[in-house]
């Protein structure tokens, strides 16, 4: 199954969190499961904050990249078209809020689930949550906006 990130053009696939071409990145992979977007990610030992727990910056990156991918996919879905069609929707973070509800254990697979809460013009608001072992440990909200034309490589402008 193709994930949202598979549709990012190579020129826009270098993000540390979601860029499939960033060899040292997290390589998150997001897909639809009904009306929710889902990412599954197993943190590595080098994602440690203190022994046994995931670093908060890694968790914020998961919320961030999961949510911007969800925002793009939701924009396509709202227009009734596939992610392989033009014009391209590629959204970036305008605002990121992360609430750490409890320490997130290192070891189990983390599941990130999200929903587009609002789609209005160039802006999509996404709510996401991370759970470990079925327990929500982090909640977040991202306001994502269409990538400014000045940042789009010429081949895709």
Please provide the spans of the model-predicted regions.
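Hydrophobic residues in beta-strands and at strand termini
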Residues: 41-43, 100, 146
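A generic structural signal for short beta-strands and their flanking turns/coil linkers
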Residues: 11, 26, 35-37, 56, ...
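HotDog/MaoC-like acyl-thioester-processing domains
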Residues: 1-10, 102-157
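Non-catalytic linker/capping segments at the edges of enzyme domains
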Residues: 1-50
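A conserved, well-ordered hydrophobic junction motif at loop->secondary-structure transitions
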Residues: 38-74
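Hydrophobic beta-strand-centered segment that forms part of the acyl-chain substrate-binding groove
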Residues: 70-111
């Amino acid at each position: 199954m193709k994930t949202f990130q598979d549709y990012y053009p190579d020129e826009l696939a270098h993000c540390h969190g979601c860029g499939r071409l960033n060899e040292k990145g997290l390589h998150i992979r997001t897909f639809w499961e009904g009306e929710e977007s889902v990412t599954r990610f197993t943190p590595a030992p080098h994602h440690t904050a203190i022994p046994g727990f995931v670093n908060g910056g890694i968790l914020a990156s998961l919320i961030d990249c999961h949510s911007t991918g969800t925002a793009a996919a939701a924009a396509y879905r709202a227009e009734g078209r596939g992610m392989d069609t033009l014009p391209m929707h590629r959204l970036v973070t305008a605002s990121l809020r992360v609430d750490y509800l409890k320490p997130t254990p290192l070891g189990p697979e983390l599941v990130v689930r999200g929903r587009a809460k609002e789609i209005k013009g160039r802006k999509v608001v996404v709510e996401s949550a991370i759970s470990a072992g079925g327990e929500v440990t982090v909640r977040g909200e991202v306001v994502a906006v269409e990538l400014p034309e000045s940042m789009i490589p010429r081949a895709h402008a």
